[in-house]
């Protein structure tokens, strides 16, 4: 009798575990559409994002999100990720980090 109850509990636990592991919430599919255009999901990245008006940020005034501009893109004043070369008033002397421009 006791072994039948144990077997039943074990079976229910296994089914629940399989259901949790195969649920869409544990897959990466929810990330599709989570970030905006030219952004990529990265929950492990820390620091400040480069911006058109601040190519070498040392202090972030707002909390960093998990959506970062893709390589070759920086944020403009409206927080949209645009190509580095599309930043207004970018002088040729202004250098962005190699991780941003993809060198």
Curated annotation (Swiss-Prot):
Keywords: Signal. The keyword Signal applies. CDD domains: TIL. It comes from the Viruses. InterPro entries: Ser_inhib-like_sf, TIL_dom. Residues 1-22 form the signal peptide. This is Probable protease inhibitor Egf0.4b.
